[in-house]
Amino acid sequence: MTESRSTFAQQLGAAKVESTLLVLFIPSVDRDSQPIDQDTWVHRALETLGELFGGATAFPQGQGVWRDDTQGGRLVFDEPVVINCYTSETLLEAQAPRLRQFLVDMGEQTRQGAIGLVIDRDYLEISFPLREASDG
């Protein structure tokens, strides 16, 4: 924490100061544009981030698009929910295995081509192989 941020936190009487921003995108469709149970995954994400990092905030659906290069560059239009979570780099590193497990579970169970997240200014993407619908 910088000195000016520390001073500002003291002036406000802040009991907690976190400076690492984690942004998670919860999809509304799978890679074949079929709807998923987004509400369940938003709840699971909030629960996971709350347990791991102390809290998170979900924002209403937006509009997005993702290019699925595995399917010839097909565009998948989506209405993602964006979740913000402030934490510390130390806690993020300590909880990385549990966060990754949640992201992989969501990606696999909702048949995503990828799950994207942002940590501070870095966009990260976990990719999933193209599977046939019957591979369940």
Describe the residue ranges of each PLM region.
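Positively charged, small/polar-rich N-terminal and surface patches that mediate targeting and assembly
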Residues: 2-136
